[in-house]
Amino acid sequence: MSNLKEIKRKIKSVHNTQKTTNAMKLVSTAKLKKTEEAAKRSKIYAQKIDEILSEISFQINKIVHNEDDMRLSLFHKKEQIKTVDLIFITADKGLCGGFNIKTLKTVSEMLKEYEAKNINIRLRAIGKTGIEYFNFQKIELLEKYFHLSSSPDYEKACEVIHAAVDDFLNGNTDEVILVHNGYKNMITQELKINHLIPVEPKSIEQTHNSLLELEPEGIELLEDLMKTYFEYNMYYALIDSLAAEHSARMQAMDNATNNAKARVKQLNLAYNKARQESITTELIEIISGVESMK
């Protein structure tokens, strides 16, 4: 009888877990739809800026080679790389399966790769998971940003990327790379590595025949464009990462719910079997008692 009570207690416990994971799945699904739309809008804007940079890349190259303006150093790839800043995004919350593993593994591999080349790599961590991971590994973090990956904010995104850009312009770093696990579709996430600085606009066929002209006096306009380019790439990465996180959590909770259902089914079978055995034992005892009284 005590065995039956124990199985019944387990069934109740697993069933409650199933309710919780299913509720979390529904919440993540709702959040994903909202974040997915925001990610699409941000991506379109960032792509348009990329297109503009591609369109004027020929003019940019002319200015870069003929001007010493410090702002144009954002387009200069240094011959010798001594320091690299790595901005990476992880989740602030858990229960999202292997969402953070790809990013943390990639960052760890990049650390080893650059150290092997005697290149100093500085980490700017966004998200509690990544911060705690590297703190545990006793690896120094240049910057730590909590609550930003779970609640992307444009002004905060600007703060993060402006600090990196300023360090590049001041000669404190030679390259800035942005790493995050991004959203691909409802069931898939993909790792994205963006070499943000120095900027290398992709040339397109129409460039040389373009009617656009960018004069050295228009560097201020270029500066505004670059500012927006960096800000939106940073903000888009945060939104994209959050959409991927919700997608991963939705999957993880769906798997957990299905596993809980399967476990409840197993426990119900075990309960019925134990109950049958208990009834059979009681019947045998009754029959044996009657026989002994004859």
UniProtKB/Swiss-Prot annotation:
Family per record: Belongs to the ATPase gamma chain family.
Complex formation: F-type ATPases have 2 components, CF(1) - the catalytic core - and CF(0) - the membrane proton channel. CF(1) has five subunits: alpha(3), beta(3), gamma(1), delta(1), epsilon(1). CF(0) has three main subunits: a, b and c.
Protein name as it appears in the record: ATP synthase gamma chain
Gene that this polypeptide is encoded by: atpG
Membrane topology: Peripheral membrane protein
Function in brief: Produces ATP from ADP in the presence of a proton gradient across the membrane. The gamma chain is believed to be important in regulating ATPase activity and the flow of protons through the CF(0) complex.
CDD domains given in the database record: F1-ATPase_gamma
Gene Ontology terms: biological process: proton motive force-driven plasma membrane ATP synthesis
GO molecular function annotations of the record: ATP binding; proton-transporting ATP synthase activity, rotational mechanism
Principal localisation: membrane
Keyword Hydrolase: no
Top-level lineage group: Bacteria
Protein's organism: Campylobacter jejuni subsp. doylei (strain ATCC BAA-1458 / RM4099 / 269.97)
Classification via InterPro entries: ATP_synth_F1_ATPase_gsu, ATP_synth_F1_gsu
Keyword Protein biosynthesis: no
Locations listed in the record: Cell inner membrane
Keyword tags: ATP synthesis, Cell inner membrane, Cell membrane, CF(1), Hydrogen ion transport, Ion transport, Membrane, Transport
One GO cellular component, as annotated: proton-transporting ATP synthase complex
